Every structure is written in C-alpha cells, then in structure tokens.
C-alpha cells in the first residue's frame, strides 16, 4: 500500500507540474526595443516592469495587452527604478524564482524521489529477505521423511545427514566431517523441496529457504550481499538447514562474457562458494541445493568441500507411485471403484507433483458434478485433462473430413503400437480435440524399464511415423497433412540419438558424434534421411498388409470418438478370427 501511495503521489505531482509548465509556456513573449519602450512609458501604456538588478532584460506588460510579455534590454542606469515609479508604473524586482525554475525544482525532486524508491524496493531487500527466512523457520518445519512417499534411495542417503546434525560427536570421534552441501537433482515435481524440509524437521533445526532467482538482481553486488546476509542469519542459529531452490539461477557455469548480468551472477556464485568454504567452524549447518539440470552447474560448486553429496531424486517407479497415490488418496473420499494400483500402473513417467495434481483434478471433477465421492469416471477425466488438457466443448467448426483425417491418423498410431510393441498397454485413443490444440491423441503406457533396446527404439520411431503413413495410405500422397509435424520432430530426435549417441548403427559403429559438438556433416544428415525413409517404407508395408484392421479401428473411432485398449484388442481379435 505504501508503494502504491508513492506511485500515485508522484503521478499527481508530475501531472500538476505539466499543467503549470503548459500554462507558463502558453504566455506570449515578444521583443521590444528600448526606444519603443520609452515611447510606451511616455504615452502611459506600460502597466508593469519586472527585473532584477543584474538581469540583462526587462519583462514589460502593457495596459492594452496584459497576456503578452515584452522583453526589453535592461539599460542598467542609476535611478531607473525611481524613473518608473514616478510614472506610476508597477515595478517588481524581488529575488523570487520564476515559474520555470519552480517547475524544474519540482520535477527534480519528484524524479529523485522516484529513483530512490525504485532502488529501495528492487535493489536491497535484505531485511524482508531475512523476515521471510524467519517465517519459513517457524511455519515450514512440519514435513517429515514419512510424508515423502517414494524416493527410498534419496531418503536413505539423507538419513546420515540428519543424524550428523543431531549427534555430530558420534562422527567427529571417528574423524568424519559432515558434508557441507547436498545437491538434490532430478526432474521437476519429484519431491526435492519436500526432502529438504524433512531434513530440517527430522533434525529439529531452523529451515531457511530461498530461490536462486531471489539472489540475482539487475544491480551488481546485490545478490552477493543477500547471500552473505542469509548465511549470517543461519550462523546465528548454530545449527540450521539452508535450502536454495533453482540453484542453477546463480550456479551456472561461468561464461567468458563481461556483461552486467554475468558479472552479477558470477559475484553471487563467488559469494556462495566463499561462504561454503568458511563452514569449518559451523559443523551444524548444511546447505541443500536443488536443480533440474545438474549438467549446467559450475564445476567449482560440485567439487568436494562444497556440495559433497549429490543425490538424484528421480521419477517414482510403480511401487512409489502407488505409495504416493495412497498418501494423497487417504486425504480424499475415494469411491470403491477407484483402483490406485491400476492408476499407478497407468501413470508411468508421472512425478509426485503430477500425481497429486491428478487426484486434485479428480476431486474438482467430483465437486463440479456434486458427487460425495471421487469415482473412477472422475479420475479418468482428470487423467486425460492432465495429459492433454480439457476437451474442447465447441466442436462445430470441425468438418467431417478433418474428423476423418484425425481418426485415421490416431488409428494408425494405435494399430502400429499393437503390431510392433504389443507389450505396451494402450490406455486411450481419442479424436476429441483439446483446448491445448491437439486434434486427438493416442496414449500408450510403456512398462517401467531402465533401458531401451535397439528394437524398441526403431519400433517407437515407426509408431510415430504410422500416423502420416495412414494418411497417405487412405487419402493419397498429395493429401497428407500437417498433423504429423510433432511426430516427425520426435522421430527425428530419436533417430539422431540412435545413430550418434547409443552406438547402435551398423555402419557408424561405436562412435558418438556428440564429441564433435553437434557439428554434423552432410554424410551424417544424409544417413539420417535415408534411415528415416527406410523406416517409413517398412511402416507403410506393415500398414498396407493390415489396412482392413486400420479401417475397422477408424470406423469405430469415428462412431464412439474414444476407444480403450480393450476395444482395440477386441477389433484385432475379431479380425484374426
């Protein structure tokens, strides 16, 4: 409110100054010679004269035209004021500021105040920073490791950190020192922040949490100052957990550029490194960083003595997903038809945050339908809302031809999945467009696996190409559409990795072009193109042999708009019989 008050006040002052300036500038000024001035005096035409002793000009106003100011050279003679007064002319030679100078002073004060307030509000909020940290210390220390479902390995690796904070003597007796820093890395939404909070809670120490972006400002030196202030606050607690989320905002590899933004980031990073190096006297303080991109961090940040321990917090497997769903599901009224085990199976590649969002969306669906329980239908709607966005309500603009193209395209993906990777579970095939712009989508659930085989990669590329193949097979080569653009992009990325990263190609052998810093030559690009054409032709042959199945799936898809994996199985089984 105080900031808004100052903004309004400055705006009003500027507006008033502008009005005064415009009024002042609206006064007409004309030059007059001194002889003409004397003639006007002798004819009693002069109303007033304004001047100061050292002024080079006089400002004269006539009785006949008081809206015009005449500028007359100042003769600077003795008794000039008496000469005018004896002729009943008003004389103003007071040492007062002109309107122009008054306006200039007002503008200078206003602009100066505005600059001061801007610097104060955006440059150095160390006190509010510490106020937030103190608030986190009281309010956030509620999460325990038991509240973090899944990530058993990560929780196990932070266990000794907690024990070290609580009983440092047990370790120091054996000459062990506590890791100065712990780096939690992994995809977004996997529970890195929760684990950091749990460490502080389990150890019973204050928790100071800030985001890396809070330290980076446009003014060089502000970020470094905030780092020092935060660490000084933590040191007063003797034992504490300092958590810096999105640490890559300040910890990226230092560039050679000398721009101001790089100077600020480098100074902030140097301040962080210095503070961590001086922790030998503060054995109860541990710094925890979190990032989605470990590979972008500066080597100096990850060396021993800084962030000694690096812990991956990955996506949950099926058992962890089941635990996470149960954790959040216990807080909601789930119906008897909601099977969390099946849901865990269908949510491959979901993070913990996505699983929480899934059940939250299901609860919203149930509330919208005024249901007392979250039913399986609500979970299904929420699942596809999270994956592809809400269904488009108004579909009147979609022509029958576009609908048919979408149906054949999605049926092509589904059929190729069934033929090439039958181990994958087809969850849903739909031609209902979403608000995210998708005309339809095909959702297949792969099995949890650490690796992909050569066959799986090539089959995945063929499945991506199958949508375009189906379009060409049914509508002709000249009628293929832009609907496969995203499929082609994904297939190209997979093929490049297949050829230059995984060493699976017979001709290229065990050589990766990644070491060449992505400087691909023409031969490599031609090889990618030829390999893609070969996979396309193989897919086209497969779809031609099963064209009848493609048409059957498409017809039912056009009729029902959405099909499940069981429907695809039934159609394939019927055709086989």
Curated annotation (Swiss-Prot):
- What Gene Ontology terms describe where this protein resides (cellular component)? plasma membrane
**Which keywords, in A-to-Z order, does the entry hold?**
ATP-binding, Cell membrane, Hydrolase, Membrane, Metal-binding, Metalloprotease, Nucleotide-binding, Protease, Transmembrane, Transmembrane helix, Zinc
Residue ranges of the TM segments: 4-24, 99-119
What SUPFAM superfamilies does the entry give? FtsH protease domain-like, P-loop containing nucleoside triphosphate hydrolases
* Pfam families linked: AAA, AAA_lid_3, FtsH_ext, Peptidase_M41
Q: What is the cofactor note?
A: Binds 1 zinc ion per subunit.
Coiled-coil segments on the chain, per record: none
Q: Which cofactor does it need?
A: Zn(2+)
What GO MF terms are annotated? Answer: ATP binding; ATP hydrolysis activity; ATP-dependent peptidase activity; metalloendopeptidase activity; zinc ion binding
Under InterPro entries, the record lists: AAA+_ATPase, AAA_lid_3, ATPase_AAA_core, ATPase_AAA_CS, FtsH, P-loop_NTPase, Pept_M41_FtsH_extracell, Peptidase_M41
* Annotated compartments: Cell membrane
Residue ranges in the Cytoplasmic topological domain are: 1-3, 120-577
Assembly? Homohexamer.
> Function of this protein?
Acts as a processive, ATP-dependent zinc metallopeptidase for both cytoplasmic and membrane proteins. Plays a role in the quality control of integral membrane proteins.
**Protein name (database record):** ATP-dependent zinc metalloprotease FtsH
Name its species.
Lachnoclostridium phytofermentans (strain ATCC 700394 / DSM 18823 / ISDg) (Clostridium phytofermentans)
């Amino acid at each position: 409110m105080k900031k808004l008050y100052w903004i309004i006040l400055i705006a009003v002052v500027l507006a008033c100054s502008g009005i005064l300036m415009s009024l002042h500038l609206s006064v007409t000024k004309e030059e007059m010679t001194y002889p003409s001035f004397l003639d006007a005096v002798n004819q009693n035409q002069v109303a007033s004269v304004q001047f100061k002793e050292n002024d080079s000009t006089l400002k004269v106003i006539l009785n006949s035209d008081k809206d015009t100011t005449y500028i007359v050279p100042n003769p600077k003679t003795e008794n000039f004021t008496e000469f005018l007064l004896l002729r009943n002319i008003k004389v103003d030679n007071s040492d007062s500021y002109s309107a122009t100078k008054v306006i200039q002073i007002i503008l200078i004060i206003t602009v100066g105040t505005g600059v001061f307030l801007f610097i104060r509000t955006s440059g150095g909020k160390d006190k509010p920073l510490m106020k937030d940290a103190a608030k986190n210390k009281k309010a956030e220390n509620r999460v325990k490791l038991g509240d973090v479902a899944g990530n058993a390995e990560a929780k196990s690796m932070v266990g000794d950190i907690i024990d070290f904070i609580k009983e440092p003597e047990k370790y120091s007796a054996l000459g062990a020192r506590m890791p100065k820093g712990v780096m939690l890395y992994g995809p977004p939404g996997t529970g890195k922040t929760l684990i950091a909070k749990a460490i502080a809670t389990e150890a019973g120490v204050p928790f100071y949490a800030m985001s890396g972006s809070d330290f980076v400002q446009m003014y060089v030196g502000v970020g470094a100052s905030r780092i020092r202030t935060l660490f000084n606050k933590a040191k007063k607690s003797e034992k504490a957990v300092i958590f810096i989320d999105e640490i890559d905002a300040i910890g990226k590899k230092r560039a050679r550029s000398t721009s101001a933004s790089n100077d600020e980031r480098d100074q902030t990073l140097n301040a962080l490194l210095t503070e961590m190096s001086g922790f030998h006297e503060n054995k109860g303080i541990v710094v925890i960083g979190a990032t989605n991109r470990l590979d972008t961090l500066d080597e100096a940040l990850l060396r021993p003595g800084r962030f000694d321990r690096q812990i991956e917090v990955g996506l949950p497997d099926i058992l962890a997903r089941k635990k996470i769903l149960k954790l959040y599901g216990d807080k909601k009224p789930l119906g008897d038809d909601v099977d969390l085990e099946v849901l865990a199976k269908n949510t491959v590649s979901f993070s913990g945050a996505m699983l929480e969002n899934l059940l939250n969306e299901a609860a919203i669906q149930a509330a919208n339908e005024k249901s007392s329980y979250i039913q399986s239908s609500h979970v299904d709607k929420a699942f596809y809302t999270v994956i592809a966005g809400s269904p488009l309500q108004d579909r009147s603009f979609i022509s029958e031809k576009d609908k048919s193209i979408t149906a054949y395209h999605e049926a092509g993906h589904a059929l190729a999945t069934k033929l090439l990777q039958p181990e994958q579970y087809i969850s849903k095939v739909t031609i209902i467009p979403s608000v995210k712009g998708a005309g339809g989508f095909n959702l297949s659930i792969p099995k949890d696996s650490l690796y992909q085989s050569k066959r799986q990669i090539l089959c995945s590329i063929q499945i991506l190409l199958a949508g375009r193949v189906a379009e060409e097979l049914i509508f002709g080569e000249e009628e293929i559409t832009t609907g496969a653009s995203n499929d082609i992009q994904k297939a190209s990325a997979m093929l490049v990795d297949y050829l230059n990263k995984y060493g699976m190609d017979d001709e290229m052998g065990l050589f990766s072009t990644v070491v060449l810093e992505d400087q691909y030559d023409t031969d490599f690009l031609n090889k990618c193109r030829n390999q893609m054409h070969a996979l396309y032709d193989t897919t086209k042959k497969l779809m031609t042999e099963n064209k009848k199945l493609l048409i059957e799936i498409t017809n039912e898809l056009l009729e029902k708009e959405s099909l499940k994996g069981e429907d695809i199985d039934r159609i394939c089984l019927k055709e086989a019989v």
